[in-house]
Amino acid sequence: MRTSISLLLSTAAVSLAWIFSGQGAWAQQSATSTEAAAHIVVTVEPKHGSSPPEIRKEDVMVYEGHDRDQVVDWIPLQGDHAGLQLFVLIDDESGMSLGTQLDDIRKFIESQPPTTKVGVAYMQNGIARVAQDPTSDHAQAAKALRLPMGAGGVNASPYFSLSDLVKKWPATNERRAVLMISDGIDRYYGTGDLQDPYLDAAIDDAGKAGIIVSAIYTPGAGHFAHSYWQSYWGQIYLSELADKTGGEAYYIGFTGAPVSFVPYLQTLEKRLQNQYLLSFLPKPEKKAGWRQIRLQSEIAGVDLISAGRVWVAAEEK
C-alpha cells in the first residue's frame, strides 16, 4: 500500500467509483475488463528512508499460491482519487491515561487533508456509538473527542463494536479506514488464545467491506490495565486485526501506556498518503470465498502491504 505514481487511464474515475461504492475488497465487474476483477487497497512502504520510490502497474505482481494473476489496474489514491473516510474508534473501557493523548489525537484529526472525512465513535457494550459521522469539517470532528468512561463492564468486546461500525457504515465511493484505540482485550470471550471467534468475525467483516484497520494500544481501566497476561493477548489481537486487514498496530509495551501517540499518528498519516487501488483477475472459482494472495514488486527496497486475502464472488455462468 504505498504512494506516488501518475497513472493515465481515462476510465480510472469511473472504475474507482464503481469499485468503492460496492464495498471494497472483493471481486466485481471491472470497468477495464469483461472479466471479474478483485480490488484491494495496497500501502507502499519503503524499507529504508521515508519516501517510497515510484511504483508502476508493471512493477506489481499478485500470486495465488504459485500462480501469478493478471494486474488490471494500479491507481494511486491521490489527487482526484484521494477521497478517504476515516473513523477514530475509541474504547470507552480505556483508562484515564488516554486523556493525556486526546490533544494529539485532536491535532491529528484537524490536520487531515480536505479529501479526508473524519468520524468519531466510542465502543460501548459491543456497540459503536457514533459521536460524529464522517465529515470534512475536521474541527467539528475533533469536538467529538472526550475522556473515556473508564468504567468496568462498559465494553463487552471491542471486536463486537468494530463489526457493528462496519455493518452500519454506509457504502461509499471513497476508501475507508479505522483507527482503533483500545487495549484489545476481549472481556466477553475471556481467556486469551488464538481462537477468539469475535476477533475472527471482525476481521472478516472489515475484510469483506474493504476497510483497513490500524490500532493503537492504550491500557484499559481496572485490573486488566496491569495484567501482563491480558495485556499480552490484547496486543496480540490488535496486531492480528491490523495485519489481516492491511493496517498496522502500534506499541507493544504490554502493561504500560505509550508515552505519546504522536509517532504512531505520524506513521499512520504517511501510510494513508502512500496507498494505491490494486485490481487483478483472480483464478475463476464456482463458489464465492476468500482467496489468499501474495504481493511482490519488481522494485527493490519496498514492501507492498495489504490484507493477505480478498473476498471473491462466484464465477458468473
Positions of PLM-derived features:
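Short amphipathic alpha-helical "recognition" segments used for binding
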Residues: 6-8, 27
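Scaffold/interface architecture of coatomer-like assemblies
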Residues: 26-317
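Bacterial N-terminal signal peptides
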Residues: 8-22
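Positively charged n-region of N-terminal signal peptides that target proteins for export
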Residues: 1-5
